[in-house]
Each structure stands twice: as C-alpha cells, then as structure tokens.
C-alpha cells in the first residue's frame, strides 16, 4: 500500500509539473500578447529622453520612431553621420513635437576613453529609457575557423554584441538609480536560447545579453528600474538578410511596436507573438532535434548567401 501511495504521489507531482509548465507556456503567449495592456512607458521611465543604439537601420530605427510616437525625445547612437542626419530629419518631419539628437560612434573599435566621452555626452540629458540594440551578425553561418573576414570579424561580433550593452548600462544607470525610475531594454536574439553550431560566437554573445539582463534585473529590482531582454527570431531587416515579411517574419515597425508593448510585464520575451509561439514549440523538442533543425537552416542560409555573392560577382 505504501508503495502504491508513493507511486501515486510521484505521478501527481509529475502531472502538476507538466501542468505548471503548460500553463506557463500558454500564459507567456496569450497573457503577454493578448491580455496585458501596454504600460505608459514615458511615465514609468521618469524622464523624457530615450537612447537607442544602432538606431538608424532596421529594428533600431523602428524603435526610434515608435518611441517618438509615444512622446519621447530621441537620442540615437550609431556609426554613420549621414544616416544619423537622415533619420533625425525623418523623425522630426513625422513627430514635430519631439527633440532628436545623435552621437556618431563606431562600436566595433572604441577605447574606454571613447566610451567615457560618449557617456558624458549622453548624460547631459535626463535619460528615461535605454535600448541597447546595436548588434552584428556574421555574413553567413560557418565553422569558427572558416569565418569570412577571419579573427577581425570574430572580434568585432564579440565586442559589438557584448561591450556596448554592458558599458552603456553601467554609465546610464546612475541617473536612473538617483531618480528611482528608468527602463533598460537589451536586444538579444533567439539564437541565445540554444547551442547553435556554425553560429557559435553570435549565439554565445546573445546568451551573454540574456544573462547580463537577468543579473541586472535582480540587482535593481527594488530600485524602480525595469530591465528586460527582448530576444527576437527572424525580422525583415537588412541585418537579417531577409526583406520579405511572412507569418513568422514581421517588418521592423510591427516588431518594435509589439516588443515595446511587452515592456514592464516580463523579464524576457521574444517581443512578437508568433516568435513566442515558435520558441515555446521548439522548447518541447529534444536537443538532437534542434541540432538537426539548426544544421539544416544553416546550410540553407549559407547556400543562399554564397549564391547571392556569386550572382553579384557575375554582374
């Protein structure tokens, strides 16, 4: 009888465990993207300026426009002066009630002195929200020693995907702590959710973003500061190499709006309902299946990239 009751107890625990994770999975999709209402970001931020790194292209540019729409003054940090000027012009033409500033900064090869100068410039304004968006992707997936561009590119991807998010957070947090309000959103990638062969450095660098965000959230959770990671899957941008939208590949404007609507409701999410469904479904499969899926996807991506390069060469 005791053995029977023990077996029943173990069975009940297993069922409850499975039920808990099932409800958690459903809620991470429906609760976050259907039932929760967006918070007033500007009110929660406690200051009028939003800083966006890599804000002249793709997701970063769409974040800049969406935050301007929500009443923030916009401070863009990016590399190319002409793109910064053009983006500023476009935002101010559409949202004349906001102020737009920019700082020209190359995140691939800065010194600590360069970062100190940048942070001094940024801290001249009251920053309510920081979006650490700047990132770099390899030309196509490949074994580490075969990376196009060699160790220079490997170094750039590693540095650009980890250092800016760390140093800008460290440099801007003091004014948020003093106000006891502020929002930091760190843009990672679904690539950080699994050990991805042929994406090793990129995947590892995006896992760093997740881990750092989680640690910072614990450090500052009682100081009125929201710190959240957004880990998207495929978005139609120049960086991703995909320009056509689909059910699981939204345009950057759609993604940015959806992602910002999740801020304040969770510690980490993909930012888009269909991406969240993808991730929750993939999490149900064993690692060997994911490895096979990643391998197939990597081969297809590499073949497309090489074919595109060959076509350009022929032209």
From Swiss-Prot:
Keywords, in A-Z order: Lipid biosynthesis, Lipid metabolism, NADP, Oxidoreductase, Steroid biosynthesis
A GO molecular-function descriptor: oxidoreductase activity
Keyword DNA repair carried by entry: no
One example of a Gene Ontology biological process annotation: steroid biosynthetic process
Top-level class of the enzyme under EC nomenclature: oxidoreductase
UniProt-listed InterPro entries: NAD(P)-bd_dom_sf, Sc_DH/Rdtase_CS, SDR_fam
Listed EC numbers: 1.1.1.-
Chain residues that bind NADP(+): 47-76
Location of the active site: 202
Coiled-coil segments on the chain, per record: none
Record's GO cellular component terms: endoplasmic reticulum
Domain of life of the organism encoding this protein: Eukaryota
PANTHER family named among the record's database cross-references: STEROID DEHYDROGENASE 1-RELATED, VERY-LONG-CHAIN 3-OXOOACYL-COA REDUCTASE
Family: Belongs to the short-chain dehydrogenases/reductases (SDR) family. 17-beta-HSD 3 subfamily.
Protein name, entry field: Putative steroid dehydrogenase 3
Organism: Caenorhabditis elegans
